[in-house]
Protein backbone atom coordinates (compact mmCIF):
# COMPACT_ATOMS: atom_id res chain seq x y z
CA UNK A 1 0.00 0.00 0.00
CA UNK A 2 1.48 3.34 -1.03
CA UNK A 3 0.88 6.70 0.58
CA UNK A 4 1.30 10.33 -0.28
CA UNK A 5 4.44 11.93 1.10
CA UNK A 6 2.48 15.05 2.02
CA UNK A 7 1.21 13.96 5.41
CA UNK A 8 -1.83 15.43 7.10
CA UNK A 9 -1.08 15.70 10.81
CA UNK A 10 -4.29 15.34 12.77
CA UNK A 11 -5.19 17.49 15.77
CA UNK A 12 -8.90 16.79 16.00
CA UNK A 13 -11.39 13.96 16.18
CA UNK A 14 -12.42 12.18 13.03
CA UNK A 15 -14.22 9.07 11.89
CA UNK A 16 -12.53 5.99 10.48
CA UNK A 17 -13.99 2.95 8.81
CA UNK A 18 -12.41 -0.49 8.45
CA UNK A 19 -9.19 -0.99 6.53
CA UNK A 20 -6.06 -3.05 6.10
CA UNK A 21 -2.66 -2.65 7.65
CA UNK A 22 1.06 -2.98 7.08
CA UNK A 23 4.03 -2.72 9.41
CA UNK A 24 6.43 0.21 9.04
CA UNK A 25 9.23 0.14 11.57
CA UNK A 26 7.95 0.43 15.12
CA UNK A 27 4.71 2.07 14.09
CA UNK A 28 1.65 0.55 12.53
CA UNK A 29 0.38 2.14 9.34
CA UNK A 30 -3.31 1.45 8.89
CA UNK A 31 -4.93 1.91 5.49
CA UNK A 32 -8.49 2.98 6.21
CA UNK A 33 -11.45 4.62 4.54
CA UNK A 34 -12.50 7.99 5.91
CA UNK A 35 -16.17 8.85 6.22
CA UNK A 36 -18.05 11.76 7.74
CA UNK A 37 -21.35 9.88 7.76
CA UNK A 38 -22.86 8.61 11.00
CA UNK A 39 -22.77 4.82 11.19
CA UNK A 40 -23.19 1.95 13.61
CA UNK A 41 -20.84 -1.03 13.47
CA UNK A 42 -20.96 -4.34 15.29
CA UNK A 43 -18.11 -3.44 17.64
CA UNK A 44 -19.26 0.02 18.65
CA UNK A 45 -20.46 3.37 17.34
CA UNK A 46 -18.63 5.32 14.67
CA UNK A 47 -19.43 8.99 15.16
CA UNK A 48 -19.06 11.78 12.66
CA UNK A 49 -16.50 14.51 13.21
CA UNK A 50 -14.23 14.68 10.19
CA UNK A 51 -11.91 17.70 10.39
CA UNK A 52 -11.69 20.17 7.53
CA UNK A 53 -8.36 18.91 6.14
CA UNK A 54 -9.90 15.54 5.30
CA UNK A 55 -13.45 16.44 4.34
CA UNK A 56 -12.53 16.25 0.68
CA UNK A 57 -11.27 12.71 1.30
CA UNK A 58 -14.72 11.47 2.36
CA UNK A 59 -15.15 7.90 1.17
CA UNK A 60 -11.57 7.66 -0.08
CA UNK A 61 -8.77 5.49 1.25
CA UNK A 62 -6.24 7.10 3.56
CA UNK A 63 -3.21 5.81 5.39
CA UNK A 64 -3.37 6.31 9.15
CA UNK A 65 -0.14 6.20 11.15
CA UNK A 66 -0.55 5.31 14.82
CA UNK A 67 1.87 4.38 17.55
CA UNK A 68 1.99 0.62 17.72
CA UNK A 69 1.16 -1.66 20.63
CA UNK A 70 1.42 -4.59 18.28
CA UNK A 71 0.80 -5.36 14.64
CA UNK A 72 -2.77 -4.53 13.68
CA UNK A 73 -4.54 -7.56 12.26
CA UNK A 74 -8.13 -6.43 12.36
CA UNK A 75 -10.05 -3.20 12.17
CA UNK A 76 -9.82 0.03 14.13
CA UNK A 77 -12.86 2.00 15.21
CA UNK A 78 -12.68 5.51 16.59
CA UNK A 79 -15.04 6.95 19.16
CA UNK A 80 -16.48 10.42 18.99
CA UNK A 81 -15.45 10.71 22.64
CA UNK A 82 -11.78 10.50 21.72
CA UNK A 83 -9.41 13.26 22.71
CA UNK A 84 -7.78 15.23 19.92
CA UNK A 85 -5.05 13.21 18.25
CA UNK A 86 -5.93 9.99 20.06
CA UNK A 87 -7.68 6.96 18.63
CA UNK A 88 -10.13 5.18 20.88
CA UNK A 89 -10.06 1.55 19.81
CA UNK A 90 -13.36 -0.20 20.22
CA UNK A 91 -11.97 -3.35 18.63
CA UNK A 92 -8.52 -4.35 17.50
CA UNK A 93 -6.82 -7.66 16.76
CA UNK A 94 -3.17 -8.02 17.68
CA UNK A 95 -0.81 -10.94 17.57
CA UNK A 96 -1.37 -11.42 21.29
CA UNK A 97 -5.15 -11.13 21.20
CA UNK A 98 -7.79 -8.43 21.26
CA UNK A 99 -7.16 -5.08 22.89
CA UNK A 100 -10.06 -4.12 25.18
CA UNK A 101 -12.55 -1.38 24.37
CA UNK A 102 -11.26 2.04 25.30
CA UNK A 103 -7.63 1.24 24.48
CA UNK A 104 -5.99 4.33 23.02
CA UNK A 105 -3.16 4.91 20.60
CA UNK A 106 -1.55 8.20 19.69
CA UNK A 107 -2.38 9.28 16.16
CA UNK A 108 0.75 10.43 14.35
CA UNK A 109 -0.35 11.34 10.84
CA UNK A 110 -2.85 10.66 8.09
CA UNK A 111 -1.97 10.39 4.40
CA UNK A 112 -4.09 10.10 1.31
CA UNK A 113 -3.52 6.60 -0.03
CA UNK A 114 -2.02 6.33 -3.50
Which residue ranges define each predicted feature?
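Extracellular jelly-roll beta-sandwich "head" domains, especially the C-terminal globular C1q domain
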Residues: 15-18, 35-49, 55-114
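Extracellular receptor-binding modules and their adjoining Ser/Thr/Gly/Asp/Asn-rich linkers
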Residues: 1-42, 46
